[in-house]
Design a protein with these regions (language model features):
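Flexible, acidic glycine-rich loops studded with aromatic residues
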Residues: 1-145
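Short, compositionally stereotyped local motifs that mark structural "simplifiers"
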Residues: 104, 108-214
Length: 214
């Protein structure tokens, strides 16, 4: 359910564990083009990290003491395929959930968390054989070239052409690609043997911004 249900529970004097659908339901899709529910929100790792389990403005000091923790939920309707989708939906969103559970609001910093996650913790997940969702690259097409921005330092980004999905055997992206057929390219981040991001296509820059008020 939503954040307000947890707040209402606390205001009625109940000990409460916060589990709002729009932040901690891991059966929600992680982007517009990925498998999963959408009724609560599109929930990526950054959105999980943004959630503050103990609302400062809505509750008194004594009421906040009734919040005993935060929890993630993963319902199974979409977990039948592809293979190991439960791991993909869980990690690294669980890492973000864990950090907000034990961190004070003033200590939270997305850039710091993301750096620690991509520099060390993803490697731990890979060594454990977890098929986590890696962070996708961004690809832009301009002046006859596709330029890819990797999601973090030394990320392994591979690409495929003609509508096929990139695999671990696909060419490694190392420099801008000259082409007229940018719409045929897909790019994906890989980590270890099991983890990968969703694939992305190159986008052209907007020609102009339209303002209907003028």
């Amino acid at each position: 359910q939503g954040v307000n249900y947890g707040i209402e529970s606390v205001k009625r004097g109940h000990k409460t564990i916060m589990i709002p659908g729009q932040y901690t339901y891991f059966d929600m899709a992680q982007s517009e083009n990925e498998r999963g529910h959408r009724w609560a929100a599109i929930i990526d790792t950054k959105r999980v990290y943004r959630y503050e389990p103990i609302p400062i403005n809505d509750l008194t000091h004594e009421q906040r003491k009734l919040i005993k923790g935060v929890q993630g939920a993963l319902w199974s309707e979409y977990l039948d395929l592809p293979a190991r989708f439960m791991e993909y939906q869980s990690y690294p969103r669980i890492s973000a959930l864990s950090e907000i559970a034990w961190s004070k609001k003033e200590d939270k910093n997305w850039e710091n968390f993301y750096s620690r996650l991509t520099n060390s913790h993803l490697n731990r997940l890979a060594n454990m054989g977890i098929a986590f969702r890696d962070f996708p690259p961004t690809a832009n097409y301009n002046k006859g070239k596709i330029t890819v921005t990797v999601p973090y330092t030394n990320a392994e980004v591979r690409y495929a052409v003609q509508s096929s999905e990139p695999t671990k055997q696909s060419p490694l992206y190392t420099s801008p690609i000259e082409t007229k057929d940018y719409e045929h390219y897909k790019f994906k981040t890989f980590f270890g043997e099991a983890a990968a991001s969703p694939s992305v296509k190159a986008e052209k820059p907007a020609v102009a911004n339209w303002n209907s008020s003028k």
